[in-house]
Swiss-Prot record:
The keyword Cytoplasm applies. Keywords: Cytoplasm, Methyltransferase, RNA-binding, rRNA processing, S-adenosyl-L-methionine, Transferase. This is Ribosomal RNA large subunit methyltransferase I. Belongs to the methyltransferase superfamily. RlmI family. It comes from Salmonella paratyphi A (strain AKU_12601). It is found in: Cytoplasm.
Amino acid sequence: MTESTFPQYPRLVLSKGREKSLLRRHPWVFSGAVSRLEGKANLGETIDIVDHQGKWLARGAWSPASQIRARVWTFDKAESIDIAFFTRRLRQAQQWRDWLAKKDGLDSYRLIAGESDGLPGVTIDRFGYFLVLQLLSAGAEYQRAALISALQTCYPDCAIYDRSDVAVRKKEGMALTQGPVTGELPPALLPIEEHGMKLLVDIQGGHKTGYYLDQRDSRLATRRYVENQRVLNCFSYTGGFAVSALMGGCRQVVSVDTSQDALDIARQNVELNQLDLSKAEFVRDDVFKLLRAYREHGEKFDVIIMDPPKFVENKSQLMGACRGYKDINMLAIQLLNPGGILLTFSCSGLMTSDLFQKIIADAAIDAGRDVQFIEQFRQAADHPVIATYPEGLYLKGFACRVM
């Protein structure tokens, strides 16, 4: 495309010296870096980002109500943001997922992981025939039609379902949306396969897009720790860890969640895999309260899986989240038999691996126990982390031996 035919975009001018992160190809521009907007841009509209002298830096999406004023689509000045752009991004992402799916025998995976796949604010999970779409930023929402058109080009045989019913959209002035986009409605429970397990996924009503694909490798790793062991599975959701523990030969697995619907699906997942249901117990309760009750009654376990929801949404909540993580891990450590294994996770992006490890160490001190770190976990490989966006590494975990 020549200069004369190239679209003219409004220009976001940065303050002097605030271009360094973009020169390092970080995909966000924060409000404090902005000097002014030249021209008029609607919410989510494409803009050019320039330094204080007018030098072109990137092309992104405008979001005047967010602390992240712009999210970068491209660092290539010759690249226009259109259907062809989204088609290229989808095909680039699919190449890696094709290799993973063939290697690991997957029928479900994360197809687009936001910024790390060059599509900020876009999450797409594939569950067999269904593509589940989440648009989390103003720019992603503005480009909805182009993105869906690209998806139809790349995946003409797939149905698309929208799960953009996420509260974070409100921060950028967007309503929550959910429903079928193209093709048939997903069934109430869709069966998928993962490392030899059959699992039922609730695309329409489940958490996020229906299932936590990012914990796939951690669920598999669980099997090596559980043979003939009594396992406590906290924040169990639909029982992925429970099924994996049973497949690993555990003596008993107790799954705890506040959602009866999730526990009912967990029970169905055990039955679907023809595992011994008598070895599985399902408890609807608050994990914090139940752990304290178990401590008071002298209950003990050999393996505890701790996979809580996100405790921290912003920096102001970090200190409180640290206390929450410490308390819950302290309780878990106190319930473990000597030599027991704690598999503990944090999906909070603001929680670094180093900080999380320190919290576990502090929890062990408060519990009066020694802990050995024996294995480290992160999100599965279909959730890549691009080098210029370390925030993409949000899931971290440890296997700990409690002495």
